Protein backbone atom coordinates (compact mmCIF):
# COMPACT_ATOMS: atom_id res chain seq x y z
CA UNK A 1 0.00 0.00 0.00
CA UNK A 2 1.38 3.39 -0.99
CA UNK A 3 1.77 5.95 1.78
CA UNK A 4 0.30 9.36 1.07
CA UNK A 5 2.20 12.27 2.55
CA UNK A 6 1.10 15.79 3.29
CA UNK A 7 2.21 18.22 0.61
CA UNK A 8 2.46 21.98 0.30
CA UNK A 9 0.10 21.98 -2.69
CA UNK A 10 -2.50 23.89 -0.69
CA UNK A 11 -0.33 26.99 -0.93
CA UNK A 12 -0.82 27.05 -4.70
CA UNK A 13 -4.24 28.55 -4.22
CA UNK A 14 -6.48 29.45 -1.36
CA UNK A 15 -10.09 30.21 -1.88
CA UNK A 16 -10.11 30.80 -5.60
CA UNK A 17 -13.89 30.99 -5.53
CA UNK A 18 -14.27 33.35 -8.48
CA UNK A 19 -11.50 31.66 -10.45
CA UNK A 20 -13.10 28.25 -9.89
CA UNK A 21 -16.47 29.51 -11.07
CA UNK A 22 -14.89 30.98 -14.19
CA UNK A 23 -12.94 27.79 -14.89
CA UNK A 24 -16.08 25.70 -14.45
CA UNK A 25 -17.73 27.90 -17.08
CA UNK A 26 -14.81 27.32 -19.48
CA UNK A 27 -14.42 23.59 -18.77
CA UNK A 28 -16.04 20.97 -20.99
CA UNK A 29 -16.25 17.26 -20.22
CA UNK A 30 -13.25 15.45 -21.67
CA UNK A 31 -10.92 18.46 -21.61
CA UNK A 32 -7.39 17.88 -20.44
CA UNK A 33 -5.84 20.37 -18.06
CA UNK A 34 -3.76 21.69 -20.96
CA UNK A 35 -6.88 22.17 -23.09
CA UNK A 36 -8.61 23.95 -20.21
CA UNK A 37 -5.57 26.17 -19.81
CA UNK A 38 -5.53 27.06 -23.52
CA UNK A 39 -9.29 27.73 -23.55
CA UNK A 40 -9.17 29.85 -20.39
CA UNK A 41 -6.15 31.79 -21.64
CA UNK A 42 -7.75 32.45 -25.03
CA UNK A 43 -11.01 33.58 -23.42
CA UNK A 44 -9.39 36.69 -21.97
CA UNK A 45 -11.34 36.14 -18.75
CA UNK A 46 -8.11 35.79 -16.78
CA UNK A 47 -6.32 38.83 -18.16
CA UNK A 48 -5.54 40.05 -14.63
CA UNK A 49 -3.15 37.13 -13.93
CA UNK A 50 -0.12 35.77 -15.76
CA UNK A 51 -0.31 32.71 -17.97
CA UNK A 52 2.01 30.92 -15.55
CA UNK A 53 -0.30 31.67 -12.61
CA UNK A 54 -3.31 30.48 -14.60
CA UNK A 55 -1.50 27.24 -15.47
CA UNK A 56 -0.64 26.75 -11.78
CA UNK A 57 -4.22 27.39 -10.67
CA UNK A 58 -5.48 24.79 -13.13
CA UNK A 59 -2.78 22.16 -12.53
CA UNK A 60 -2.27 22.58 -8.78
CA UNK A 61 -5.76 23.59 -7.62
CA UNK A 62 -8.60 23.04 -10.07
CA UNK A 63 -7.53 19.67 -11.49
CA UNK A 64 -6.73 17.93 -8.17
CA UNK A 65 -9.92 19.24 -6.60
CA UNK A 66 -12.43 18.73 -9.40
CA UNK A 67 -10.95 16.56 -12.17
CA UNK A 68 -8.91 13.82 -10.48
CA UNK A 69 -9.17 10.93 -10.52
CA UNK A 70 -12.36 11.47 -12.54
CA UNK A 71 -14.07 14.70 -13.61
CA UNK A 72 -17.38 13.95 -11.88
CA UNK A 73 -17.03 16.82 -9.35
CA UNK A 74 -16.47 19.32 -12.17
CA UNK A 75 -19.46 17.91 -14.05
CA UNK A 76 -21.74 18.34 -11.03
CA UNK A 77 -20.35 21.72 -10.02
CA UNK A 78 -20.60 23.06 -13.56
CA UNK A 79 -24.34 22.35 -13.46
CA UNK A 80 -24.67 24.11 -10.09
CA UNK A 81 -22.33 26.98 -10.91
CA UNK A 82 -24.16 30.31 -10.60
CA UNK A 83 -27.48 28.53 -9.95
CA UNK A 84 -27.17 27.91 -6.21
CA UNK A 85 -26.41 30.45 -3.52
CA UNK A 86 -22.78 31.43 -3.00
CA UNK A 87 -22.63 30.01 0.51
CA UNK A 88 -23.68 26.53 -0.64
CA UNK A 89 -21.26 26.62 -3.55
CA UNK A 90 -18.42 27.65 -1.23
CA UNK A 91 -19.21 24.68 1.03
CA UNK A 92 -18.95 22.32 -1.93
CA UNK A 93 -15.62 23.89 -2.94
CA UNK A 94 -14.48 23.49 0.69
CA UNK A 95 -15.31 19.76 0.62
CA UNK A 96 -13.47 19.12 -2.64
CA UNK A 97 -10.48 21.13 -1.42
CA UNK A 98 -10.35 18.96 1.71
CA UNK A 99 -10.57 15.80 -0.39
CA UNK A 100 -7.67 16.91 -2.57
CA UNK A 101 -5.43 18.20 0.25
CA UNK A 102 -4.80 15.62 2.94
CA UNK A 103 -3.27 18.12 5.37
CA UNK A 104 -6.36 20.33 5.10
CA UNK A 105 -8.71 17.37 5.53
CA UNK A 106 -6.88 16.23 8.66
CA UNK A 107 -6.72 19.77 10.02
CA UNK A 108 -10.50 20.01 9.72
CA UNK A 109 -11.26 16.57 11.12
CA UNK A 110 -8.57 16.33 13.79
CA UNK A 111 -8.39 19.90 15.07
CA UNK A 112 -11.11 22.22 13.80
CA UNK A 113 -14.12 19.98 14.47
CA UNK A 114 -12.72 18.64 17.73
CA UNK A 115 -12.30 22.17 19.03
CA UNK A 116 -15.69 23.22 17.73
CA UNK A 117 -17.36 20.24 19.43
CA UNK A 118 -15.57 21.16 22.66
CA UNK A 119 -17.10 24.64 22.56
CA UNK A 120 -14.17 26.64 21.23
CA UNK A 121 -15.11 29.57 19.02
CA UNK A 122 -11.73 30.15 17.40
CA UNK A 123 -8.37 28.60 16.61
CA UNK A 124 -5.11 30.44 17.13
CA UNK A 125 -2.07 30.68 14.90
CA UNK A 126 -0.26 28.60 17.51
CA UNK A 127 -2.91 25.84 17.30
CA UNK A 128 -2.41 25.65 13.56
CA UNK A 129 1.38 25.79 13.84
CA UNK A 130 1.41 22.97 16.41
CA UNK A 131 -0.74 20.85 14.10
CA UNK A 132 1.74 21.31 11.24
CA UNK A 133 4.74 20.72 13.52
CA UNK A 134 3.21 17.45 14.77
CA UNK A 135 2.62 16.41 11.18
CA UNK A 136 6.20 17.05 10.09
CA UNK A 137 7.75 15.43 13.16
CA UNK A 138 5.25 12.57 13.01
CA UNK A 139 6.27 11.41 9.54
CA UNK A 140 3.25 12.75 7.69
CA UNK A 141 5.47 14.76 5.35
CA UNK A 142 8.01 13.22 3.01
CA UNK A 143 10.72 15.54 4.32
CA UNK A 144 10.97 17.90 7.25
CA UNK A 145 9.58 21.29 6.30
CA UNK A 146 11.43 24.54 6.86
CA UNK A 147 10.22 27.02 9.46
CA UNK A 148 9.06 29.28 6.62
CA UNK A 149 6.98 26.50 5.06
CA UNK A 150 5.52 25.55 8.45
CA UNK A 151 4.57 29.15 9.13
CA UNK A 152 3.06 29.60 5.67
CA UNK A 153 1.05 26.35 5.73
CA UNK A 154 -0.16 27.05 9.27
CA UNK A 155 -1.45 30.40 8.14
CA UNK A 156 -3.11 28.94 5.04
CA UNK A 157 -4.90 26.23 7.01
CA UNK A 158 -6.27 28.77 9.43
CA UNK A 159 -7.32 31.26 6.76
CA UNK A 160 -9.44 28.72 4.88
CA UNK A 161 -11.54 28.04 7.95
What is the meaning of each model-derived region?
Residues 107-123, 129, 142-144:
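A contiguous catalytic/ligand-binding core that recognizes phosphate-bearing ligands
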Residues 1-114:
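Eukaryotic partner-binding/assembly regions in large regulatory complexes
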Residues 59, 63, 154-159:
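Short, hydrophobic-biased segments on the C-terminal half of alpha helices
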Residues 98, 102, 122-126, 144-155:
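Short, amphipathic alpha-helical segments
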Residues 51, 119, 133-153:
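Short, positively charged loop/turn segments that connect secondary-structure elements
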Residues 114, 134-138, 160:
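Amphipathic alpha-helical interaction surfaces
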Amino acid sequence: MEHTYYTTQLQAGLGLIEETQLLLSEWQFGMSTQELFQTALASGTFSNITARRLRNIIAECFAPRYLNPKPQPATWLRQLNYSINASSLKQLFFIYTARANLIFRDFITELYWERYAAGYTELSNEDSREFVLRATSGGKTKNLWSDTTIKRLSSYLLSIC
